[in-house]
């Protein structure tokens, strides 16, 4: 057996081994959860309620921040939810967060919605924060998103919900908005599809080995409500071209804003929140 032939065999075996590792451990390349102790006390500067809900064999940890005025007074109309509690005057916003951290860190963005008269719902995916279990498939991730939306639907109608997704959460948000008929959809640093993003990062991996497809473009194209997209021009993780490719799936009145930001600093831009507030008021 020639040296070249042996080398080819060795390279093929190595390639197959690498692909096997990527298939069975790809969650470690996508999800970066930060766990919290079950007795962790959340601390925020505004009123909130802690949520624990069942989702496909495990439990999901969540928070509901109550709508309030800038001077701290709660903003509620006369309508009431299924529990007899008065509803926030502008309805609810649910935020599907990115692939790292947990509720303690993501909760700081609640004020951008509660100050506008929205009750703000935020959940950790399984394996994040206080949530149990672990993500092992796209189906589990979808089950988490469904459980989150169904919880919010206990408090208000779908037509009163603004669905917001950042990074990893953008595809889940688009799916939830389309599936449940939400009022509006807001995407921040979205991917065109998670499968294509993975292929962009790892072009040597065959498509059939990528477990997480999440075709954001399909969900955006099937959503009838207003869509707003924000993307950093200098995004180094999910390039702005992902949002530009979503353009052909948008309707009249939908908007894309390209901002002077990267991936990890876009949520710190006051310009983003100012434009988001304008869109929510339309």
Predicted regions and their residues:
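Short alpha-helix in the alpha/beta-hydrolase fold that links the catalytic acid
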Residues: 109, 216, 225, 239-248
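Catalytic histidine-centered segment of alpha/beta-hydrolase-like enzymes
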Residues: 262-272
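Alpha/beta-hydrolase fold nucleophile elbow
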Residues: 157-167
């Amino acid at each position: 057996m020639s040296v070249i032939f042996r080398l080819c065999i060795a390279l093929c075996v190595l390639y197959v081994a690498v692909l096997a590792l990527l298939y069975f451990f790809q969650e470690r390349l996508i999800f970066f959860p930060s766990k919290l102790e079950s007795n962790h006390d959340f601390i925020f500067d505004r009123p909130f309620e802690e949520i624990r809900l069942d989702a496909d064999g495990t439990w999901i940890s969540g928070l509901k921040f109550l709508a309030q005025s800038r001077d701290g007074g709660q903003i509620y109309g006369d309508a009431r939810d299924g529990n007899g509690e008065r509803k926030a005057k502008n309805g609810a916003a649910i935020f599907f967060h990115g692939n790292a951290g947990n509720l303690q860190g993501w909760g700081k963005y609640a004020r951008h919605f509660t100050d506008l008269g929205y009750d703000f719902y935020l959940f950790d995916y399984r394996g994040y924060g206080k949530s149990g279990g672990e993500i092992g498939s796209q189906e589990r991730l979808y089950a988490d998103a469904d459980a989150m939306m169904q919880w919010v639907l206990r408090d208000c109608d779908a037509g009163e919900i603004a669905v917001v997704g950042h990074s990893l959460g953008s595809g889940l948000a688009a799916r939830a908005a389309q599936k449940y008929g939400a009022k509006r959809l807001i995407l921040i640093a979205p991917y065109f599809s998670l499968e294509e993003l993975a292929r962009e990062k790892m072009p040597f991996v065959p498509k059939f080995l990528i477990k997480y497809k999440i075709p954001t473009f399909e969900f955006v194209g099937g959503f009838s409500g207003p869509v707003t997209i924000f993307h950093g021009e200098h995004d180094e993780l999910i390039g702005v071209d992902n949002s530009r490719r979503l353009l052909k799936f948008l309707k009249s009145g939908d908007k894309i804003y390209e901002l002077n930001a990267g991936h990890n600093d876009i949520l710190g831009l006051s310009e983003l929140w100012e434009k988001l507030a304008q869109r929510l008021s339309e």
